[in-house]
Amino acid sequence: MRALAAFRAAGGLGLNVTLPFKLQALAAADQASDDARLAGAANALRSEGERIEARNFDGIGLVRDIEVNLGLPLKGQRVLLLGAGGATRGALAPIARAGAARVVIANRTAGKAAALAQEMAPHLAGTVVEGGGF
């Protein structure tokens, strides 16, 4: 995190974070958005005075791309997410907020998908979440 301290000391106010540093970015923050907390990772940090705020825009970007760029509203739809890693964790809450009726997480390791679905379901009111293998 020396790089973050040097960035801030040089006047930096915000930055984007990529793999493999998303988990460390969240840990370095003083506060985090709900999406970052739920995903367990952050892809953006912003200085707020002496504090650092972590955010996760992965899912917000995905939903915007689907709904705005492709013109496909997610409200009431079934969504299939392949993989049960960080990208899926970051996408689940924004997809649920967009009104998806059901999200199926498919992963090579069925147990990992099922565990993620079970962990996240209580946080995604109004959206059924299930996981399995492929």
Q: What is the role of each PLM region?
A:
Residues M1-G71:
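Phosphate/diphosphate ligand-binding glycine-rich loop within oxidoreductases
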Residues N16-L19, G83, N107:
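Conserved residues at beta->alpha junctions
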Residues Q24-A25, G90, A115:
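Phosphate- and divalent-cation-binding pockets in alpha/beta enzyme and binding domains
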Residues A27-D30, R64, V68, A93-R97, ...:
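Short, well-ordered alpha-helices that flank and scaffold nucleotide-derived cofactor binding pockets
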Residues A54-G59, I66, L70, K75-A96, ...:
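Glycine-rich adenosine-cofactor-binding loop
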Residues L80, V103-V104, E130:
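A structural signal for isolated positions on well-ordered beta-strands in alpha/beta enzyme cores
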Residues A98-H123:
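NAD(P)-binding Rossmann-fold cofactor-contacting core
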Residues L124-F134:
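Short acidic low-complexity segments
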